[in-house]
Structure formats: C-alpha cells, structure tokens
C-alpha cells in the first residue's frame, strides 16, 4: 500500500516529462499499471474476475 504522500506527489506535474510515472488509482502500486484502466495488474485481475469492469471478461480458447 502506497503512502498518501506518494499518491499526492504523483498527481503533481513534474518539471521534466521523464520524471513522471503512473500509479494504480486503486491501491497506489507504481509498477505494471494498465494506462487504459488506471489500475495495476493485480487490481485489474481482481475487479475483472468479479465482473466490475464493463466490457472485460476472461478469455478462454
């Protein structure tokens, strides 16, 4: 779980563009964030399996 200060710090626009990074909107995790959903892979998997993300379902073939 990310500290509240890190979540607030991430929302500020950096002076240089390369200093910017993404965080999960749900838990604040800085790695493996899906830009389209603004969620990390773990939160995305949990919410998708519960059916809480519209238009997303588990693939089977």
UniProtKB/Swiss-Prot annotation:
Gene Ontology molecular function: rRNA binding; structural constituent of ribosome; zinc ion binding
Free-text comment on the cofactor: Binds 1 zinc ion per subunit.
Cited InterPro entries: Ribosomal_uS14, Ribosomal_uS14_bact, Ribosomal_uS14_CS, Ribosomal_uS14_sf
Residue numbers binding Zn(2+): 24, 27, 40, 43
Cofactor field: Zn(2+)
Entry's Gene Ontology BP terms: translation
Annotated keywords: Metal-binding, Ribonucleoprotein, Ribosomal protein, RNA-binding, rRNA-binding, Zinc
Short name of one Pfam family: Ribosomal_S14
A Gene Ontology term for the protein's cellular component: cytoplasm
Domain of life: Bacteria
PANTHER family on file: 30S RIBOSOMAL PROTEIN S14, SMALL RIBOSOMAL SUBUNIT PROTEIN US14M
Subunit architecture: Part of the 30S ribosomal subunit. Contacts proteins S3 and S10.
Biological role stated in the UniProt entry: Binds 16S rRNA, required for the assembly of 30S particles and may also be responsible for determining the conformation of the 16S rRNA at the A site.
Matching HAMAP family: Ribosomal_uS14_2_B
Family statement: Belongs to the universal ribosomal protein uS14 family. Zinc-binding uS14 subfamily.
Protein name as it appears in the record: Small ribosomal subunit protein uS14
Organism this protein belongs to: Spiroplasma citri
Gene name of the encoded protein: rpsZ
């Amino acid at each position: 779980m990310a500290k509240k200060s890190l979540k607030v710090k991430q929302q500020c626009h950096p002076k240089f563009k390369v200093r910017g990074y993404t965080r999960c909107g749900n838990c604040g995790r800085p790695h493996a964030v899906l830009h389209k959903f603004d969620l990390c892979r773990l939160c995305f998997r949990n919410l998708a399996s519960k059916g809480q993300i519209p238009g997303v379902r588990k693939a089977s073939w």
